[in-house]
């Protein structure tokens, strides 16, 4: 038997990962002619990271945002997340990538949470009929295995206000830092970064099992070897999932469906398959 724990934090923004693994097993002889075995193993994991709802999302998009961020443009000015609007300080037609502010997203409730929970069970019981002279070489074995996989994903994506500095500093009016920067609210133009504008929750489960009954015979009579095998197997598997999403969450949402604006659109999808 054994168990292990693994934890990791990101060196780039908000990222937490935790995972537990466990395993146990036993093999036993029940008298001279019968033996049994049993094993159980599983894991539980959870990952949380800030949600990047643009350019494909994920940590790769975050890395790209940081690599292409202009070093002379601070993330915040006067407590407001700012974006670079070009040498001409344009006020429209900015793409979502241009509006993306890495720190603003990191400081928002926007989050992706993935949880997994897996378990495997295996057991067998075997009996040797060698205790009776007419059934020597005859063995009967029954085995059972089951696998259960559970997954859950929660996503929070809001709309975040980011800002354009209307009158920049310096003699050329292009600097974002300096003592001459006007920090009054009137010197900031507002843009909206759409980082998904929805809440989603997805849950899925896969449950499968297999049973085998095997009758085998192997015996030598003088110069002759006689053997045979008979087996019966039964297996079933089922999968089901449910997904729900709702639009227009508040900027202070806690990820629940009641923390959204009036008139938000809510949808639910679910399915189940068996084999």
Please give the residue ranges for each predicted region.
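Short acidic, gly/pro-rich beta-turn/loop elements at beta-sheet edges
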Residues: 11, 32-34, 48-50, 133, ...
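Outer-membrane beta-barrel transmembrane strands
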Residues: 2-6, 94-156, 196-227, 239-241, ...
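"Short basic amphipathic alpha-helical interaction patches in structured regions
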Residues: 14-19, 104-106, 156-159, 245-246
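A surface-exposed, glycine/aromatic-enriched loop/edge motif typical of exported proteins
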Residues: 43-93, 150-182, 243
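Acidic, glycine-rich active-site loops and adjacent beta-strand->loop/helix elements
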Residues: 7, 41-45, 146-148, 232-236
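Transmembrane beta-barrel wall of Gram-negative outer-membrane proteins
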Residues: 2-49, 118-121, 222
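Outer-membrane beta-barrel transmembrane domain signature of Gram-negative proteins
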Residues: 158, 162, 167-275
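Alpha-helix N-cap/helix-initiation motif
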Residues: 11-19, 23, 27, 112-114, ...
């Amino acid at each position: 038997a054994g168990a292990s724990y693994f934890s990791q934090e990101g060196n780039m923004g908000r990222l937490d990962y935790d995972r537990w693994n466990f395993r146990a097993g036993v093999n036993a002889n029940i008298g001279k002619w019968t033996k049994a075995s049993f094993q159980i193993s599983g894991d539980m994991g959870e990952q949380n990271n800030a949600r990047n709802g643009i350019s494909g999302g994920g940590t790769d998009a975050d890395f790209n945002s940081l690599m292409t961020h202009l070093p002379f443009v601070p993330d915040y000015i006067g407590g407001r997340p700012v974006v670079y609007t070009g040498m001409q300080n344009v006020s429209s037609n900015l793409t979502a990538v241009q509006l993306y502010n890495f720190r603003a997203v990191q400081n928002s409730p926007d989050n992706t949470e993935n949880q997994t929970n897996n378990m495997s069970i295996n057991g067998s019981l075997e009996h040797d009929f060698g205790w009776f002279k007419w059934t020597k070489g005859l063995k009967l074995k029954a085995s059972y295995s089951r696998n259960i996989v559970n997954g859950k994903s929660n996503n929070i994506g809001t709309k975040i206000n980011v800002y354009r500095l209307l009158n920049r500093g310096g003699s050329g009016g292009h600097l974002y830092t300096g003592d001459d920067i006007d920090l009054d609210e009137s010197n900031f133009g507002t843009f909206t970064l759409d980082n998904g504008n929805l809440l989603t929750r997805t849950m899925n489960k896969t449950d499968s099992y297999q049973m085998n009954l095997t009758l085998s015979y192997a015996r030598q009579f003088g110069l002759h070897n006689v053997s045979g095998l008979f087996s019966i197997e039964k297996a079933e598997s089922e999968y089901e999932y449910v997904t729900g999403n709702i639009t227009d969450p508040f900027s202070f949402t806690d990820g629940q469906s009641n923390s959204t604006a009036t008139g938000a659109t809510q949808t639910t999808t679910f399915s189940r398959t068996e084999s």
